[in-house]
Amino acid sequence: MPINCKAKCGKAAALKRPKTGDALCKECFFAAFEAEIHHTITSSKLFRRGEKVAVAASGGKDSTVLAHVMKLLNERHDYGLELVLLSIDEGITGYRDDSLETVKQNRDDYKMPLKILSYEELYGWTMDRIVSQIGRSNNCTFCGVFRRQALDRGAKLLCVDSIATGHNADDIAETVLMNVLRGDTARLRRCTDIRTGGGEDSIPRVKPLKYSYEKEIVMYAHYKKLVYFSTECVFAPNAYRGHARAFLKDLEKVRPSVIMDIIYSGEQLRFKDTAKNPVRGTCNRCGFISSQQPCKACVLLEGLNRGLPKLGIGKKSKGDRMIAKQDQELALRERANLVKNDF
């Protein structure tokens, strides 16, 4: 016997919402999913009329659903936003080159301008080349740092007021877990923020999908027949986040509400005054936002260019010793060449 839609629309239920457990027809699920994102946007005052917003587009399910829903809500509720797509090409063969084709399809489907920036044009390196130098143990560190700065650079080029990213509820719960396990209070106190950055030298980032379950995003994309790229990054299986994700999935089997429980717990955390946030300024080399001098992106890039790919991994003092040792070796070689030339 078919189950009726809980919204009492008179139709048979087609699915069970992972977030609430409600049995809904497709149309009522779409309405509920979109209404929740609209509530997140309006209650958190993420945008103001007349603003230009860059939607961070990777071609995956999250960014595709974000672009679709942002366009739909912008028109339905008259937000008055100018929407553009911003995509970063990390240079990962067999992954990003294929997903960019999906991004271009999103551009055509949603009639949004698209800007693509590559690591190669920004840093002179691709992730394929970086991994060939460092192996697969720390590749996500390089990619994450470069990607964050690349989005800032792209946003500055496009003169946008904010960047909307596709971080969903699962992503944020995973990040809370990771920061707890690492004892990183500085990141823990801000990882649940729906808006980060902002100020004179940085462009704010917002998360309209903060309270949207990953399973529901997949269901929405499936039933809406949205075009998205579903292949996982070839370097992702080695990431530390994967362990937090697996742990979270196990917890979810026992307690379905665990994702929202973790997010709400993260939002309610209180820290002693002694646990200070890092002071954010601008990098004295590249001029982009940073809490250290030089910024992490510049340190990692210097390591690659010097042939010391592990320079930016670990404590700053370790990197300083590596630079000092290399400079000393170069000085000794130059001195030896001078002596040789004298004879």
Curated annotation (Swiss-Prot):
It is found in: Cytoplasm. PROSITE patterns: UPF0021. Belongs to the TtcA family. CTU1/NCS6/ATPBD3 subfamily. One of its GO terms (molecular function) is tRNA binding. It is an enzyme of class 2 (transferase). GO terms for biological process: protein urmylation; tRNA thio-modification; tRNA wobble position uridine thiolation; tRNA wobble uridine modification. GO terms for cellular component: cytosol; cytosolic tRNA wobble base thiouridylase complex; mitochondrion. Keywords: Cytoplasm, RNA-binding, Transferase, tRNA processing, tRNA-binding. The keyword Transferase applies. The keyword ATP-binding does not apply. This is Cytoplasmic tRNA 2-thiolation protein 1. Its EC number is 2.7.7.-. Pathway: tRNA modification; 5-methoxycarbonylmethyl-2-thiouridine-tRNA biosynthesis. It comes from Drosophila pseudoobscura pseudoobscura (Fruit fly). CDD domains: CTU1-like. Its main location: cytoplasm. Plays a central role in 2-thiolation of mcm(5)S(2)U at tRNA wobble positions of tRNA(Lys), tRNA(Glu) and tRNA(Gln). Directly binds tRNAs and probably acts by catalyzing adenylation of tRNAs, an intermediate required for 2-thiolation. It is unclear whether it acts as a sulfurtransferase that transfers sulfur from thiocarboxylated URM1 onto the uridine of tRNAs at wobble position.
